[in-house]
Amino acid sequence: MSRSFDDLLPTALDDISLAELSPLTRVGDLLILLERWVERGWLRALDKAFVAFLSDLDPQADPLVLVAAALTSHQLGHGHVCLDLYETLKEPDFALSLPPEGDQQGGTMLLPSQLLAALDGAAWCQALAGSMLVAEVGDSSAEALQKPLVLAERRLYLRRYWTYERRIAAALRQRLAQSETPPEDLPQRLNALFGPANSAPQAIIDWQKLSCALATRKGFSIITGGPGTGKTTTVVRLLALLQAPAVQSGQPLRIRLAAPTGKAAARLTESISQQVQSLDVSDDVRQKIPSEVTTVHRLLGSRPGTRYFRHHAGNLLPLDVLVVDEASMIDLEMMANLLDALPPHARMVLLGDKDQLASVEAGAVLGDLCRDAEEGFYSPDTQAWLEAVSGEDLGKGGLRQGDAQQHPLAQQVVMLRHSRRFGQGSGIGQLARLVNQQQDQQARTLLAAGSHDDLFALALKGEQDLKFERLVLDGLGRGEQGPQGYRHYLNVLTAERPADDSALDDACWTRWARSVLSAFDAFQLLCAVRKGPWGVEGLNQRITHALFNAKLIESEQQWYEGRPVLMTHNDYGLGLMNGDIGITLRLPERDGEGKQVLRVAFPRNDGSEGVRFVLPSRLNEVETVYAMTVHKSQGSEFAHTALILPEALNPVLTKELIYTGITRAKHWFSLIEPRQGIFEEALRRKVKRLSGLMLGL
């Protein structure tokens, strides 16, 4: 019978002084320390349980192995696929996010830096290599395949994530080695879709045209670019480029479109629907270009309550082309599942912004795969072929030349470089570029200048500064056509409410709900963290209180009319996905007796402009969403976006987080700072998610 973690702990926890512990030489002492870390919120209960499991497997396990396992599991929760043993030893506390955000407790708690102070990287690796719990790369014996940990030089993995990484790498190598046959008249087809190349010396390279050309060569390609660079326009033309010859041959391609969230899928559905209609192609081709976008989970056929899908290597997806939008949100496990379920002959095209935040779950797949996108690294053969079929002069692009053997993946990646949404005169566009380049002083100067109508910076003087409430409630005070706050959608809710005697099945209720949902998209407050006075939890309470005091909402209780909620998990029974936003409204009861009940209105996200009304009692996995994390905002856009930073520097504060927050704004962006300087400190830090995915790619 397996022992629980509690069984492994000495009973007199409170009687043992932390100073007397020897956690790197005695397993019992290590377990006591880990329990204390869990009590303080430094480790997850899951990390603790994993160590208990390993101790059960090997009662003689070296504490060095167990502490490495605990930290690897902990890092997984922070998005890292593996633990780099040497990097961890350089700056243990910050590298491990220990103590975590918001921990203000004092005391004599043993920190990772103290625990690991005398440890040498080589000795740590040696201890792991000698453990019965750890398999080394290259050992494919039956015994090794049963070991829960994998050591790859200086990187330690949980076996499952090592397997995901290798499955992705193997699938990509297979697709990159597999040449497709582009149409013989590819140059003419490209010119028909994009126009002939401009030979003027100052002409801008048509990167959209190049990305479509490259996608015809192999079974895998990536189109990356920032907001407004035309990723959707490009993919619509790519689908026309691929589908036209197939339709003409009488064998149209089966094309599927997917996105990670319901909101991202709805945005792409709407955008593609509009653009397909304006394509200069025959009606036969137009009819075979799909506009309906599904979520990745629905595409694969998610099995509720499990991590398995209906489609997998033994039951492949019935398609010839798969396009995945917002690919930066796809984590390592999901990418492995997608590639497993893809037929060998099918093409896969990833769309996304490589500079956005990585997925919430482990991995930074798009960022890893686009590592060379900025500089190109096209081989002479790739460049010559692109120039021949497109007429473009890549010599003007300032790219670095590469070797197809050393950079096989780079040959199938194109970065779109010209934003049509944020032109040279856009303050948002300029700020996003400066943030991406980590030009912190220039970014501060731009914000301080006040010379752009679409940028605003608010420095707060303490937690009770009323300027925060004014911005969140009323925006920037420039009237109905300017940047709004939350008063706007609540005014729409009140002003446009249908007559009370309207029947529930009257279309006026759906029109009203759509109007309120649209008005809510006029403003969104984004946070970097969840905890503390400047985190999601505290700010949602504060804004709710401010709206109640302003008599804009009727209650501060859990459910009230006007409450905006965010789905935090998928609910397939209700057809709602993680990230979907709904607004609580008061509607007539179905029995028509004149009573009204609260229902939550969610957009149907299928391009139909429909609304799904759900009783609050059926929504178990929702939270109030006046404030949401930047992570949760990915795939969404808001007319006016405000980003509030915490006072203290935190590992999540990076230039990627700031960039993602800025680029959620369509028309106006506001930066809110409780402390001057935190913006610059964040810009100097980059996300570095540890993985070995690019080895060999």
Which role fits each region the language model picked out?
Residues L210-C212, T216-H452:
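ASCE P-loop NTPase helicase motor core
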Residues D355, S359-V565, D571-G573:
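Conserved helicase motor core of P-loop NTPases
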Residues R3-I16, L21-D185, S328:
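N-terminal accessory nucleic-acid engagement/regulatory domains that precede
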Residues T88, I168, T261, T295, ...:
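Residue-level signature of catalytic and energy-coupling elements of molecular machines
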Residues A200-T216, W512-A513:
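Pre-Walker A adenine-sensing motif
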Residues P183-D206:
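N-terminal pre-Walker A segment at the start of P-loop NTPase domains
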Residues P343, Q558-E561, M577, S633:
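Residue-level recognition of short, solvent-exposed, well-ordered loop/turn junctions
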